[in-house]
A protein has these predicted regions:
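Nucleotide-activated sugar donor-binding and catalytic core shared by glycosyltransferases
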Residues: 1-377
Length: 377
């Protein structure tokens, strides 16, 4: 069968490539054409447009690049029409993808399947109308999305979470502490891991407070998980003259050797939980308490970390915006390092999260459902 996929950013490229690999096993004659990236291209098929030429986030960047944005929309529509796939598969990236869903469904009558739901449970809930109209099947990777969509009388399939898959096959899963510190020239002291984000603005806002708070725990060494694409020189402006180390491309290995972690919100909070490392979730943004109150008003959820969202209760402490202070981080870090009951309680919460996430196999489960559904038409 013929498959057209659209992924508009790096994470989508990764998830779509895994899905393509699984689709080939279900359908050895699969033909692919796609908007995506290098990982998708490595699975075979035709790359029509690289996501690096599409990644305009926010009102101003879109406005400044409106000609390119409109060109990409026209190109995608005409290419889908010419290829006329058996199914259009969309991966997150809702601003662009919901336009394509409408076009494929209303103009071409092509089945539309969505892998990885847009986060409409957090903001822009009005997008549910377009999803109900134009998306035939939604494959979710977050279990709490099921009741959200049920509330809107729309049935979705939870297929598992890709992070569980990544954890299950990660290398060095049995690595010893001595081996890790020797390879990375670290001290023979327990580790507090610092995961300060993936973008320079995030790191600049979060890392200094993380270092200040964690430095109080002198029996521990501080180790930063360096983000991909960020140079060591950038980090050195924050750690120069301080007893802080950094490792690159070893985040999972660092976490599993750590006694605790300070983590910015995002997938990293879930990865830390799956590896059973106690954590404090930290996130700084401009605007202080006013921005925080506005942020909480706009968001439709009680929590920002995936761990707490999946558990539907507070498992990990979230120190956001004006609550993210050196003193608050020190207090919470002290609890998860030195209070056995607190550590035990958090690990029990992690176990409940892991139970709700289920077993590995998210892309494989989605691929089976896609192929079976299209063949049944």
């Amino acid at each position: 069968m013929k498959y057209y996929l659209i992924a508009g950013e790096a994470s989508g490229d990764l998830h779509a490539s895994k899905l393509m690999n699984a689709l080939k096993k279900e359908d050895p004659q699969a033909q692919f054409r796609f908007f995506g990236g290098d990982l998708m291209q490595a699975e075979g098929g035709t790359l029509v447009k690289h996501y690096s030429e599409m990644a305009y986030m926010g009102f101003i960047p879109v406005l400044l690049n409106i000609d390119k944005v409109l060109h990409n929309i026209r190109l995608c529509k005409s290419d889908i029409e010419e290829f006329h796939p058996d199914v259009l598969i969309l991966v997150d990236y809702p601003g662009f993808n919901l336009r394509m869903a409408k076009f494929a469904k209303t103009r071409l009558n092509i089945p539309v399947h969505y892998y990885i739901s847009p986060k409409i449970w957090a903001w822009k809930e009005y997008r549910i109308k377009d999803i109900k109209r134009y998306v035939d099947k939604m494959y979710s990777i977050l279990p709490f999305e099921i009741p959200f969509y049920q509330k809107h009388h729309y049935q979705i399939d939870y297929v598992g979470n890709p992070t569980v898959d990544e954890m299950a096959v990660r290398p060095f899963a049995d690595e010893k502490f001595d081996s890790f510190i020797s390879e990375n020239n670290l001290e023979n002291k327990p580790i507090i891991a610092l995961l300060a984000g993936s973008r320079k603005a995030e790191i600049t806002a979060n890392l200094p407070i993380m270092i200040d708070a964690a430095s109080s725990f002198t029996d521990y060494q501080l180790v930063i998980a360096g983000a991909p694409g960020i140079s060591p020189d950038f980090y050195h402006t924050f750690i120069s003259g301080k007893r802080v180390s950094i490792v690159f491309e070893k985040t999972y290995r660092l976490l599993q050797q750590s006694s605790a972690a300070l983590v910015t919100s995002g997938t990293a909070t879930l990865e830390t939980a799956i590896l059973k490392i106690p954590q404090v979730v930290c996130y700084k943004m401009g605007g202080g308490k006013i921005a925080y109150n506005l942020f909480k008003h706009i968001l439709k959820v009680k929590f920002v970390s995936l761990v707490n969202l999946i558990a539907d209760r507070e498992i990990v402490k979230e120190l956001l915006v004006h609550l993210f202070t050196t003193e608050n981080v020190k207090n919470e870090l002290d609890k998860i390092l030195n209070d056995p009951d607190k550590r035990k309680q958090m690990l029990q919460g992690y176990a409940k999260v892991a139970e709700r996430l289920g077993n590995p196999g998210a892309p494989q489960n989605a691929a089976k459902k896609i192929v079976a559904t299209i063949k049944s038409l």
